[in-house]
Amino acid sequence: MQVLVRDNNVDQALRALKKKMQREGIFREMKMRGHYEKPSEKRAREKAEAVRRARKLARKRAQREGLIGGRTGAR
């Protein structure tokens, strides 16, 4: 992975690198590989993530169609 350093601005280059790594999912991968995950645990986690994604997609779809209101912050 490469990042251009312009005008000796290392801070800006570091921010760009972090953003690229975040987009690629490297931080998440490092966190996951920090300890061994049993195959059964991996399957359970992936299934839970898929359910979460499906619910989020259904919620967004319903909101877009006007079935439910958006998040307003008021309770």
From Swiss-Prot:
Keywords: Ribonucleoprotein, Ribosomal protein. Coiled coil: none annotated. GO terms for molecular function: structural constituent of ribosome. GO terms for cellular component: ribonucleoprotein complex; ribosome. It comes from the Bacteria. GO terms for biological process: translation. HAMAP family: Ribosomal_bS21 (MF_00358). Belongs to the bacterial ribosomal protein bS21 family. NCBIfam families: S21p. This is Small ribosomal subunit protein bS21. It comes from Brucella canis (strain ATCC 23365 / NCTC 10854 / RM-666).
